[in-house]
């Protein structure tokens, strides 16, 4: 799980607040639920952020479009719109398995 912070109107890209695997991921998601923070499930994106990012740093520029699509979706549903969950595209060179190995195209 990866927790991001982004303030509309602020300069800069979203920042990684927390990230973890296994038990830590469960704690991150539990805390988000407790605080009524929307959770968007995309294991492929979570892995890309986890294996290319650092806590306290902005996300990789290569993931801007993927994260922007999610943020746009979340902002709209927070305003009461009912939308289908978008399909998130992850650049092929940033696709990892759960162990951090780059995915090999078939």
State the predicted function of each range.
Residues 1-106:
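Divalent-cation
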